[in-house]
Structure formats: C-alpha cells, structure tokens
C-alpha cells in the first residue's frame, strides 16, 4: 500500500512539473504570406573549391587550389553558385594574407570551355613563387576576391567556417 501511494505521488508530481505554455503566444500568419528564404552558406562549388559570396549573393567566386602546382583558379559563378558567369574583365584581384601581411595577386582571364568570345568565367594565378612557398592547402587561403562585373565592383572575403 505504501509503494502504491508513493507511485501515485510520483506520477502526480511528474504531471505538475510539465511544460508551461502560458508564456507562448500564437501568431496567426495571414493567408498568402510567404516566408523569406534565409541566407545560407554554400559548402563547395562545382569544381570542388571554396565559395566566396560576391554582393548579396548576386555572384560567387569559387577558389580552387591545386596543391601540386600551387595554381589558384577562380571561377565566376552566378547567384546559384552552380553555373558559370563569364565576365568582360581581363583579371580579378586576389588578396591573400601571407605571413600576417596582405599580398595582392592578379588572376588572369583564361577562357573556360563554353565561355563566349572576349569573356571569361575562369581566372588563374600560376607559377607564383610566394604562393608556392606559403600556400600549401585550402586552409592557407585567407583574404578576399575583388571582381568588376557589369560595371560594378564586388569584393568577397575568403572565410573558412568550422
């Protein structure tokens, strides 16, 4: 009998300690209202590189490092970060932090397959001794990408999120 009373007491206590929804208000959403998509982070670009947002996701730059050759390739992508976005520029500025100092590099246009004449979606920094000596993997890439696209200058930071 004593155990039965103890059991009833414990169950009653558990029911009293439940969630209190008294502080939560219900907000009805008007019919036809749409929820705005939240900004999201892209993990990897179509070439397996790190994505850099240019503007308010108007464009993206994909940064790809070939550790064997120390070549850095930048791909200009559209707002979806999936399709090439060929631009008129002959170069893109790549600023990297090397030895705690910012260093500027010029990535030259190298037309990619499918790029129209006089436009490029691919830019490269190749055979650079500073990059060869200091950039060993993607984690060493810290800095920014600056590109002139359709008369507007876009700059995006190379950020590694862990």
Task: List each language-model region with its residue ranges.
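Intrinsically disordered, low-complexity terminal tails/loops enriched in metal-binding residues
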Residues: 10, 17-162
